[in-house]
Amino acid sequence: MNVKVKICGITTPEQAEQAQRAGADAIGVVLYESSVRQVGFQLAKDIISTVDSGVCSIALVVNASTSRIYKIIEHLKPTFLQFHGDESPEFCNQFNYPFIRAIRMRADLDISSAIKNYEAKGGFLFDSWDDKLYGGTGIRFDWSRLPKQRNFPLILAGGLTCENVKDAIQTVHPYMVDISGGVESSPGIKDPYLVKLFIQNVKG
């Protein structure tokens, strides 16, 4: 099984280049002001400009305005948007632009209802629930809650590490795994050794 790897919360072009050299399939930048991994517009553009053809660039947003989304599409031109907030299907679909929809795994969540009507060409990313944080929790959820039978690309996030990613893949069989804090030396600072080790553990 050829599982892909997304390194999210990249904060410098150098980190993006290091991650790609290590074998990352996707590079994520966070355009959400409340995140410790948030980058400004120009820096996001600089990071995305380093992304090679064949590697996806992903712009993560949380409850952004319509005008901001159009600005991201026009000026950053990411491969995918990633909606990680409380955005409705109507909101996400209106841009007619490829996107990933993040689903935060609240305890009482019904997954089939949560994904309904989203035209998420990039798939659905399942992340841990936190009532204050939109992603980046560093906490894993119960992977057994995810559907075994599915007709969409499943991206697994939430508390992944170099140590647990093999178990995660064996349990969930995801299309892609997504990591941020699990390969950092401090918030927003990716550790090249951990990035390389994580990718080796996924693809090795």
Feature annotation, model-predicted:
Residues 1-204:
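Conserved N-terminal beta1-alpha1 strand-loop-helix module at the mouth
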